């Protein structure tokens, strides 16, 4: 048995719920990491590992520490990325896995980096004709040109971390501070 926490012998070849042929059986579920969303990742990663085990996969939780360090168990065939925010969604962990030759869930490091960074993703969406609300990218001290109300978001942050809705001019400085 590759990962004893699953409580089943390894070597299953079909997903016991769907009957789909499995390409990999030994799965490292990466969770944690350095971001402000670490605690959410620990919970969601544990749920992913439990669900994979229930479907007959040999899955193990692999905690990525706050310094981005982790060790994959010997025999890992694929990594399931269950990390959020910095290093999880921005292409960081994906680049490390690629360098180690480990297949992983999700997109390439480059695609993750572009999608995570709103200064890169918004223009790509506009160019592709995907509807997006009016926006502007501001650096510290630059004046806003969009009329209130506005939503202020950090350029490189996941989920709703650092997001504010601004309805009055006096709310603007606090929203900018939160986004940085």
Regions found by a protein language model. Give the residues of each.
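Rossmann-like NAD(P)H-binding beta-loop-alpha module
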Residues: 127-158
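An N-terminal domain-start capping segment
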Residues: 47, 103, 108-113, 164-180
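Solvent-exposed alpha-helices and their adjacent loops that cap or buttress functional pockets
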Residues: 21-22, 72, 142-145, 154-158, ...
């Amino acid at each position: 048995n590759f990962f004893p926490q699953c409580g089943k012998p390894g070597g299953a070849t079909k997903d016991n719920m769907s009957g789909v042929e499995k390409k990999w059986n030994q799965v490292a579920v990466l969770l944690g990491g350095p971001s402000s969303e670490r605690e959410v990742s620990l919970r969601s990663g544990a749920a992913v590992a439990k669900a994979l085990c229930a479907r007959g996969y040999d899955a193990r939780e692999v905690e990525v520490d706050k310094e981005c360090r982790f060790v994959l168990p010997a025999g890992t065939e694929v990594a399931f990325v269950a990390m959020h925010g910095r290093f999880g969604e921005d292409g960081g962990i994906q680049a490390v896995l690629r360098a180690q030759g480990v297949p992983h869930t999700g997109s390439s490091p480059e695609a993750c980096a572009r999608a995570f960074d709103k200064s890169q993703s918004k223009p790509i969406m506009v160019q592709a004709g995907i509807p997006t609300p009016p926006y502007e990218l501001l650096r510290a001290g630059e004046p806003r040109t969009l009329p209130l109300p506005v939503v202020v978001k950090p350029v490189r942050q996941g989920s709703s971390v650092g997001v504010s809705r601004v309805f009055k001019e006096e709310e603007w400085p606090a929203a900018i501070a939160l986004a940085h």
